[in-house]
Amino acid sequence: MQNRHHARLLPSSALLSHEAAAGVMLMAASAIGMVFANSIWQASYEYWLNIETGPLTMRGWINDALMALFFLLAGLEIKREILYGHLSHWSQRLLPGVAAIGGMVVPAIIYVAFNHSGEALRGWAIPTATDIAFALGVLALAGSRVPGILKVFLTALAIVDDLGAVIVIALFYTGTLSVLPGAGVAAILGLLLMLNRQGVRTLFPYLLAGVPLWWLTLKSGIHPTVAGVGLALLIPAGHDEASPLMRLEHMLSWPVRFVILPLFGFANAGISLHGVTVGQMLSPLTLGVGAALMLGKPLGVLGAVSILQLSGASGFPPYITWRHRIGIAFLCGIGFTMSLFIAILAFPGTAAVNQIKLGILSGSMLSGLCGYILLRGPAVADR
């Protein structure tokens, strides 16, 4: 029975190849951004990203508007997994849920150990996230050597991580609230809830309401990407592929993974290395983020899994070796997209962002490399 249950939960090869391709696209776009930021095109790169178009710059439209669609998709995936997927039963939620909490708490503690005072403390949440596109991309490179149950575990953990990141952004990175726009946000959410309760399954009214919801959220002082999650939670769900939730998820999946996330990587991963000193590379901000991702994430995930295994509450099957566990824990240290996003919120328009980005890039790359090396070992068949 347990074997059939595991088999039912294994993600399809099509899904994994889709995620892997998205991860490769994100890596490529980020690398191109780095090339532009350190070449003769640096001035043009910065100029185009900082052109004001309406109320926002080009970078602002990417980070505040397009990324709201990323959070809408993330919210839909979280809702689907909790209702019908890998997290639909408490027994399924326990292992990835506790591992995700451990993987958020320990990196935050390590970051604070390096940056325990002043403005730097605002970045405590930066190393707490896992980039599912990057992580699954690296996992796909290891091929059939990786037991399927680890792919399920990583996917479920990243979903819980996304949920934690959304809560952190809403609670800790919201500015001064404006009453009237905030009231408008509440009114639109109330209207959407009413539509949901009345059984309205046409997507159009939900998407139409999403536009003023985003605008009022932006004006209220709450980060506008939170509007995407709020909208996702009120989209009607269902078991079948024809449900509004599933239809919208399919509509958003390709443009978010292959257009929006690469654009985000291109616009935000570009760090100018001209004039970077050893002191900056070894600054508490850079070291704090890098160490938190590369050491804190795997320690937190492994520690949480070990506690559950020893207590008998949950755990991996016996054929999952320590090499597999450590390898998958290292992949959780690939923070990238969400870490960059939180860094921008924590240190808007400051010189500290470049030091943070160095830590994110170095910590994520080293975590991915360590995870890949460990998972490239001899294949283990699923049982």
UniProtKB/Swiss-Prot annotation:
The family assignment reads:
Belongs to the NhaA Na(+)/H(+) (TC 2.A.33) antiporter family.
Q: Which InterPro entries match?
A: Na/H_antiporter_dom_sf, NhaA
- UniProt keyword Transport present: yes
UniProt lists the gene as nhaA
Q: Kindly list the organism's lineage.
A: Bacteria, Pseudomonadati, Pseudomonadota, Alphaproteobacteria, Acetobacterales
PANTHER family on file: NA(+)_H(+) ANTIPORTER NHAA, SODIUM ION/PROTON ANTIPORTER NHAA-RELATED
* Annotated Gene Ontology cellular component terms: plasma membrane
Its recorded name reads: Na(+)/H(+) antiporter NhaA
Matching NCBIfam families, A to Z? NhaA, PRK09560.1
